[in-house]
């Protein structure tokens, strides 16, 4: 949002005048953190996406205004101070367009002004100073205040959204009207205490919903009728507050919220920015600019009760604390409204002293996890209200027949949100809750959780579709909480996601290995000897005896498949976990590659095959690089030779197979997951020890050289990849953010 002054003396009367506005949509180091594509984020629209207005103003007009309120104890009366800033554009020459300003002393003028205040509902004149206008001497600009005392005021609230309107008239000395301006305002007071929120002195629960301003046909440039329809649909649901998100919406939305009585939390797009980035001076300056633009544009709306300075921040970090402190100080200078941020962290919050309250974004915990989270928040939020900033349930739009036991069904979304709201309504310690989300929206990154949907970059978390068609959840919530009639929900059956096919594959791998051992004598002997008599076996590799390349390839495939089975099960189990998606997306920013990965995660058998092939290729690449790196130490060997060493050193990895077959079930129990991790670590150490034995035997006199070379090759490969991802995408910085959040929620 911006304004540009075009002065009269640069316009050529009677001729064509062209005003060009050029917008630079390229991201630089300052803006990149604010537009980074993230799963479950929003689609970035660039260019001119809002209306452009050419406003004709007289040379003397109102440039800015604000209202300060001082209510009495029972909110029946209020002392009001209007502050107006008048601008004399005739004082500034055309050179100001190029950055300089010249005052024209002959244009110093005397003006007067008066205001009329009406109750919008009754259109009744409440206050005015028509009989005694105030007169001022204006040079380039002048600021003035006007005081009124109101009695028996009608307060603005969701139940009675009473608006007032003031009409300001600027007059000359001869009472000629120079300019007129009018705007709505309201008497509304919001406060936060340790036990919750108070609107006009009365305690209120924030029953909210998260609205992302987007439509499949219009992008972010929604027509006014759709904006109004959205607010009405929200009002009809019994919602009393909207969380925008996370970026300022069109001002017309707030006009409608003013009229319909829906409170608003509005925030800037500082979404999931890690401490290492958010603490930079240039990022703080850019965020401060966004905050100032938002507040200056929207601070006159009574519906807006709070400004958000950040979303899903790591509030345990000192650099985040510095960011929050700087933006909090900035906001306090601009406006007196409440300040907040959101975080996924349940504890260890170092920043909450600089805001009035915080939102906790939980995404989609099951009911038991939600209750546990509330208990944890009660323990650590003894002096501040608990507000859940984001909680919802995603659906597969095509799954209209499944019952509520199917977690991707439309019925389950209704059942889940109904239970969440019941807990919210029955627990006085929860002061606010925002359902996620009003309608489906499009993102820039395919989501793993949308793997069964036809459109993976459309996030189906809405209780309405993208086209504003109410889902079962909307109908259920409206019926339950507005009409007090309970709609019946069908339980259905729990879909089988046990992945028994992967267990069958594990048995097939095991049977295949047994057949090879039984039918091929040399293969069986090599397999047994590599495990029982590794020193003798590696002596045979030195002498090129008994080892055929096909045996090495087969044993390598079996070992790789044993690990691939475990990885595929792990990925499939966490396919709907938001933070798993975030961590994956920290390293995979290509939309095409992410789409392929999503397909593999949702098709574990194909995933096992791809992981197996990938591991074999990695082993082959290591062997190739190792062979040529050894030449630096005058050590001669073949690619096959090094390949044999690496593969047969890992024969013990076959024993991972039964654990990989059981991992899907063990992931549901933390203790079993720890055991599986210990088993993996054991076999990894076993592999390293066997590999060192092989190197020691094969390169007796060059052992240290070979060992160092192998470590260097591995370091260069892994370090090079890590350096690339970190320098290009800040992958590890973002992954660290998400891991810290997961740790906070699991403590």
Map each language-model feature to its residues:
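Accessory beta-strand-rich segments of carbohydrate-active enzymes
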Residues: 1-62, 89, 263
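Extracellular glycoside hydrolase catalytic/binding regions
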Residues: 322-426, 459-463
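Extended acidic/polar, glycine-enriched regions
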Residues: 14, 87-91, 106-191
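Active-site-adjacent substrate/metal-binding segments within catalytic domains
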Residues: 28-30, 51, 55-68, 153, ...
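Hydrophobic alpha-helical transmembrane segments and adjacent short intramembrane/lumenal linkers
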Residues: 599-613, 619-730
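Selected alpha-helical membrane-embedding segments in polytopic membrane proteins
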Residues: 517-520, 524-634
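Substrate-binding cleft of secreted/luminal carbohydrate-active enzymes
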Residues: 409-450
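Aromatic-rich peripheral "rim/lid" segments of glycoside hydrolase catalytic domains that contact
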Residues: 437-495, 500-505
């Amino acid at each position: 949002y911006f304004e540009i002054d075009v002065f009269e003396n640069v316009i050529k009367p009677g001729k064509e005048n062209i005003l060009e506005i050029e917008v630079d949509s390229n991201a630089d180091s300052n803006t990149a953190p604010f537009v980074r594509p993230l799963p479950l984020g929003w689609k970035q629209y660039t260019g001119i996406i809002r209306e452009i207005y050419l406003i004709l103003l007289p040379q003397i007009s109102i440039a800015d205004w604000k209202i300060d309120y001082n209510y009495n104890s029972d909110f029946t009366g209020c002392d009001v101070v209007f502050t107006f800033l008048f601008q004399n554009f005739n004082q500034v020459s055309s050179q100001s367009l190029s950055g300089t300003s010249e005052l024209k002393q002959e244009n110093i003028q005397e003006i007067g002004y008066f205001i009329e205040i009406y109750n919008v509902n009754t259109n009744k004149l409440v206050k005015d100073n028509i009989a005694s206008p105030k007169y001022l001497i204006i040079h380039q600009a002048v600021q003035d205040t006007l005081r009124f005392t109101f009695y028996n005021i009608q307060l603005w609230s969701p139940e009675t959204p009473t608006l007032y309107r003031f009409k300001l008239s600027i007059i000359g000395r001869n009472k000629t009207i120079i300019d007129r301006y009018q705007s709505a305002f309201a008497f509304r007071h919001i406060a936060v205490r340790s036990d919750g929120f108070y609107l006009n002195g009365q305690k209120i629960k924030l029953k909210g919903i998260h609205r992302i301003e987007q439509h499949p046909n219009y992008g972010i440039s929604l027509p006014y009728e759709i904006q109004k329809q959205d607010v009405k649909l929200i009002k009809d649901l019994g919602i009393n507050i909207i969380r925008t998100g996370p970026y300022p919406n069109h001002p017309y939305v707030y006009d409608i919220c003013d009229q319909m009585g829906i409170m608003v939390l509005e925030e800037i797009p500082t979404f999931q920015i890690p401490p290492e980035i958010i603490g930079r001076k240039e990022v703080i300056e850019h965020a401060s600019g966004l905050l100032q633009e938002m507040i200056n544009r929207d601070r006159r709306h009574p519906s807006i009760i709070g400004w958000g300075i950040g979303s899903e921040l790591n509030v345990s970090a000192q650099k985040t604390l510095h960011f929050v402190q700087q933006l909090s100080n900035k906001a306090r200078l601009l406006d007196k409204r409440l300040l907040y941020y959101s975080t996924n962290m349940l504890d260890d919050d170092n920043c909450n002293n600089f805001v009035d309250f915080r939102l906790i974004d939980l995404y989609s915990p099951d009911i038991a996890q939600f209750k546990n989270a509330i208990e944890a928040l009660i323990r650590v939020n003894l002096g501040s209200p608990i507000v859940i900033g984001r909680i919802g349930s995603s659906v597969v739009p095509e799954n209209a027949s499944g019952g509520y036991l199917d977690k991707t069904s439309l019925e389950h979304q209704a059942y889940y949100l109904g239970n969440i709201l019941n807990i919210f309504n029955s627990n006085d310690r929860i002061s606010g809750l925002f359902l996620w989300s009003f309608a489906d929206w499009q993102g820039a990154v395919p989501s793993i959780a949308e793997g069964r949907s036809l459109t993976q970059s459309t996030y189906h978390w809405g209780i309405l579709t993208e086209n504003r068609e109410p889902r079962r959840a909307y109908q259920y919530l409206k019926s339950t909480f507005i009409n007090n009639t309970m709609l019946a929900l069908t339980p259905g059956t729990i879909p089988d996601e046990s992945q028994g096919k992967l267990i069958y594959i594990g048995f097939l791998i095991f049977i295949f290995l047994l057949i090879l051992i039984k039918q091929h004598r040399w293969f069986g002997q090599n397999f047994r000897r590599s495990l029982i008599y590794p020193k003798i076996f590696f002596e045979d590799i030195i002498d090129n005896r008994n080892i055929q390349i096909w045996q090495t390839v087969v044993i390598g495939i079996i070992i790789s498949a044993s690990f691939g089975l475990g990885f595929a099960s792990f990925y499939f189990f966490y396919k709907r976990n938001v933070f798993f998606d975030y961590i994956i997306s920290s390293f995979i920013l290509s939309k095409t590659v992410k789409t392929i990965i999503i397909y593999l995660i949702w098709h574990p058998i194909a995933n096992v095959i791809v992981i197996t092939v990938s591991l074999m290729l990695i082993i082959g690449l290591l062997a190739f690089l190792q062979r040529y790196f050894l030449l630096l130490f005058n050590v001669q060997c073949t690619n096959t030779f090094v390949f044999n060493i690496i593969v047969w050193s890992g024969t013990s990895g076959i024993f991972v197979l039964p654990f990989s077959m059981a991992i899907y079930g063990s992931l549901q129990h933390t203790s079993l997951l720890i055991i599986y991790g210990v088993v993996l670590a054991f076999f990894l150490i076993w592999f390293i020890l066997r590999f060192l034995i092989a190197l020691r035997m094969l390169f007796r006199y060059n052992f240290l050289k070979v060992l160092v070379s192998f470590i260097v090759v591995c370091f260069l490969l892994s370090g090079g990849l890590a350096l690339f991802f970190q320098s290009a995408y800040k992958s590890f910085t973002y992954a660290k953010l998400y891991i810290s959040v997961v740790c906070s929620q699991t403590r």
